[in-house]
UniProtKB/Swiss-Prot annotation:
This is Anthrone oxygenase encC. It comes from Aspergillus fumigatus (strain ATCC MYA-4609 / CBS 101355 / FGSC A1100 / Af293). It comes from the Eukaryota. GO terms for cellular component: membrane. It is an enzyme of class 1 (oxidoreductase). InterPro entries: Anthrone_oxy (IPR013901).
Length: 181
């Protein structure tokens, strides 16, 4: 029978890796598909922004809570660790996973704000936005496609934080199991 601590290890490691996949999927799949649809099918910036905003809202709604639960599990494992190495690895894993929050605020915040402002402005002028023209009345030197490409890059980096946490947690678990033999 598995111990509670063993189950927490599984939840923490899987949570970090799963969250990384969730975040990275937007960078590697969703946004490239939007950009390709824009260029290949002539979809309007309004529609592209509307879909991006829904993707963003789903991530914004769930990712911080998943990161908090995963980080809490790693912090608990660090607190329970009797040896210094797993304690440091689990502690670093907790910080790495929770690092998506300050990373998002500091590095992605300006791009998120521009895209959300542009999306709101496009929503207000929906009848004219369906012609496939990019906005000219939002103060920004970047086009919608450039902003989305930049967001894609930043989100790709963001996805590495929980992945690093999951890998560090796995190393800590393996180190702990090796020491138990």
């Amino acid at each position: 029978m598995a111990s509670v601590q063993g189950l927490i290890k599984i939840v923490a490691i899987t949570g970090g890796v799963w969250l990384s996949g969730k975040i990275t999927a937007h960078s590697l799949v969703s946004v490239p598909a939007l950009l390709q649809t824009r260029s290949a099918d002539g979809l309007s910036p309004c529609t592209i922004l509307r879909v991006w905003r829904r993707i963003y809202e789903q991530g914004h709604r769930h990712s911080p809570q998943i990161a908090a639960c995963t980080s809490t599990a790693f912090a608990y494992l660090a607190w329970c660790a009797s040896d210094r190495t797993p304690r440091l690895l689990y502690g670093t894993a907790a910080c790495s996973v929770m690092g998506i929050v300050p990373y998002t605020l500091l590095f992605m915040g300006p791009t998120n704000s521009r895209l959300l402002e542009r999306s709101a402005a496009e929503e207000e002028k929906v009848p004219g936005a369906t012609r496939g023209e990019d906005m000219v009345n939002v103060p920004s030197e970047m086009t919608t496609e450039e902003l989305l490409s930049h967001w894609r890059f930043l989100a790709g980096i963001r996805g590495l934080l929980p992945l690093a946490g999951g890998i560090l947690g796995l190393f800590a678990a393996l180190y702990s199991n090796e020491g138990a033999r």
